[in-house]
Amino acid sequence: MIRLSLIIPTYNRARQLLAALESVVRQDMPAGEWECVVVNNNSTDDTAARFAAFAARYPALNLRMVTETDPGVSYARNRGIAETSAPYMAFIDDDERINAGFIRAYVEFFDAHPDAVVAGGRIIAEYVSGRPAWMSKYSELPVANPMDFGHAVRPFPAGRVPGGGNMAFRRSATARYGGFDPSLGRVGGMLIGGEENDFFERMM
């Protein structure tokens, strides 16, 4: 039984996506209890072909790709929600890597906290050649969206919500509150945000 669906929207970042998937296939959760659904948001590069070749290497895992033709991360996330049925859903971005216990941690959290609807975790920015000199502690938040409140399970600080690169929620939440607002969120190279804040504010 699939207990959690990991959803990864992607657009024209085949190389980064494959690096993310390399971390996904190392999950320590039994393969029959999770799936990974990549939402191809009309990529024009070789994302589809490279994903197919990658997935063929892991026939025992539930790896699949679906397509969303309307551009924008909100449309892509909503497509991922529509194409899955697991009671729990988690989202990461296509340029991230997750640790081996990522999926198991979310499943165990929701199992242990039946009243919890939403959860989020650490997002640690990694810079290829060091933190850019122009980036201040103020500009890093909207650009890299780092988030680190430690390892302990606790409520999110007042005024903060999970980041889109590491968030999870119960499927029942989307049935009650709807999905992501397509008028918000990144579209192609346009770094428009706000879709996560809007989504979580509807739940509060």
PLM feature spans:
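A short, conserved alpha-helix in the catalytic core of glycosyltransferases
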Residues: G164-F169, A173-G178, G185-M204
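Cell-envelope/extracellular polymer assembly enzymes that use nucleotide-activated donors
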Residues: I2-S5, E35, D198
